[in-house]
Swiss-Prot record:
Main subcellular localisation: host cell
Segments traversing the membrane: none
Organism: Rotavirus A (strain RVA/Human/United Kingdom/ST3/1975/G4P2A[6])
One Pfam family named in its UniProt record: Rota_NS6
Family stated for the protein in its record: Belongs to the rotavirus A NSP6 family.
Coiled coil: none
Localization of this protein: Host cytoplasm; Host mitochondrion
Alphabetized UniProt keyword annotations: Host cytoplasm, Host mitochondrion
Name listed for the protein in its UniProt record: Non-structural protein 6
GO cellular component, one term: host cell mitochondrion
Recorded superkingdom: Viruses
Subunit structure: Interacts with NSP2 and NSP5.
Length: 92
């Protein structure tokens, strides 16, 4: 499986169970240290999906994926290396 397909599957798999997770979250449950990470992930995911119809997802899905990715990293005890690895892996 090539890297492009792996990234696509990764982004799609972030949507699994997204509705219950997304709607259970409190609006202010993500603290300030993760807000900039959300913006970074949103930008990287958009870069990954914007040029190819095969990768295009609607805005709500992108916001949900961004939030879930942020929460996933947040749950890894704010491990800087895990954060950098995730960002590098999602990056085009």
């Amino acid at each position: 499986m090539n890297r492009l397909l792996q990234r696509r599957l990764f982004l799609e798999n972030l949507l699994v169970g997204v509705n219950s997770t997304f709607h259970q979250m409190q609006k202010h449950s993500i603290n300030t240290c993760c807000r900039s990470l959300q913006r970074i992930l949103d930008h990287l995911i958009l870069l990954q999906t914007i040029h190819s119809p095969a990768f295009r997802l609607d805005r709500m899905q992108l916001r949900q994926m961004r939030t879930l990715a942020c929460l996933w990293i947040h749950r890894r005890n704010h491990d800087l290396q895990a954060t950098l690895d995730a960002i590098n892996w999602i990056s085009p």
